[in-house]
């Protein structure tokens, strides 16, 4: 009798439970119909990425007027980068400030990020797109460990987010058939309604939670990418701003004599919008999608160049009342 009851239980209930498990997520046919985001990538241009040679300063920042000459700048250790001028002598390199540094004080050539954002189609995407923020293999079910049988996905892979399930207070997104990732492993560019107070046709939104930027023409999002905004101790301020000053290349330096001293030569495609906080290109890291700056909005050189040129016609310099592009900084969520 016990054997019969157990057999009936297995026949009646186990298939039902299995079917419920199989129903987690959307129909595989839908995933097959929309396998990846319908966006156009912005490809990097080698002649723009590699037109300069950047080096990190390993030792205290000391610059000389000539090889074996006198010290004309001595600012100590920090997060310091210089650009080589292409002129060298044994054990010495000239930098763009027309000064010289010892070769032993400089690192090897900096590796430039090749990351680029995407252009949105005219019609809204059927599913929210996202970028993966680390190398990973997706889990087979929400909340599970990575499945070694799932294909390896590189950081910055573009994926569709088909649906989500909450596990222990956090979202897990379905990115394929039996493929799920934790919300912290992806960044989503989330279009927002045009805020009141935006005073330019072209404008950008900066989402500090998702670490993304979206460029708009009117109410339509046209371009999106990943950023790195200010760390908690040097936050990027929320609010509505306008770019007030722009430069194709500029020196950025601050906190001299303090532990967070930095000196960055030739920061590319720079647009200041909040005091000394700017949107700008970044040659010294490839960690987009995470906060890591001194307050500025770091972008790849590819993305910052596009944004700079796309917005260059916003301000009419023949009209004294004209302003440069509006920048809306907000947060779509709260950091834990």
Regions found by a protein language model. Name each.
Residues 197-199, 223, 231, 235-240, ...:
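Exported/periplasmic cell-wall-interacting domains
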């Amino acid at each position: 009798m016990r054997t019969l009851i157990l057999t009936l239980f297995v026949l009646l209930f186990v298939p039902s439970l299995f079917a419920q498990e199989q129903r987690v997520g959307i129909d595989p046919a839908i995933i097959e119909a929309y396998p990846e985001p319908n966006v156009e990538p912005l490809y990097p241009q080698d002649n723009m990425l590699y037109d300069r040679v950047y080096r990190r300063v390993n030792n205290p920042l000391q610059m000389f007027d000539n090889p074996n000459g006198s010290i004309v700048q001595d600012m100590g250790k920090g997060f310091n980068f210089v650009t080589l001028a292409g002129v060298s002598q044994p054990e010495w390199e000239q930098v763009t400030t027309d000064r010289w540094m010892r070769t032993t004080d400089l690192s090897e050539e900096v590796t430039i990020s090749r990351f680029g954002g995407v252009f949105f189609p005219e019609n809204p995407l059927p599913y929210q797109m996202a970028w993966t923020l680390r190398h990973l293999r997706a889990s087979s079910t929400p909340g599970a460990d990575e499945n070694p049988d799932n294909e390896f996905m590189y950081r910055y892979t573009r994926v569709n987010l088909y649906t989500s399930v909450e596990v222990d207070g956090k979202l897990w997104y379905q990115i394929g058939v039996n493929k799920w990732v934790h919300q912290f492993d992806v960044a989503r560019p989330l279009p927002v309604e045009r805020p009141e107070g935006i005073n330019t046709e072209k404008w950008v939104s900066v989402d500090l939670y998702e670490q993304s930027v979206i460029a708009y023409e009117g109410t339509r999002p046209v371009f999106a990418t990943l950023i790195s905004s200010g760390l908690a101790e040097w936050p990027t301020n929320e609010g509505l701003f306008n770019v007030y000053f722009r430069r194709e290349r500029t020196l950025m330096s601050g906190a001299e004599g303090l532990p967070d001293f930095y000196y960055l030569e030739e920061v590319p495609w720079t647009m200041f919008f909040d005091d000394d906080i700017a949107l700008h290109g970044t040659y010294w890291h490839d960690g987009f999608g995470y906060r890591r700056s001194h307050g500025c909005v770091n972008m790849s050189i590819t993305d910052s160049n596009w944004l700079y040129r796309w917005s260059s016609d916003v301000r009419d310099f023949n009209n004294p009342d004209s302003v440069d592009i509006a920048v809306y900084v907000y947060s779509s969520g709260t950091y834990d």
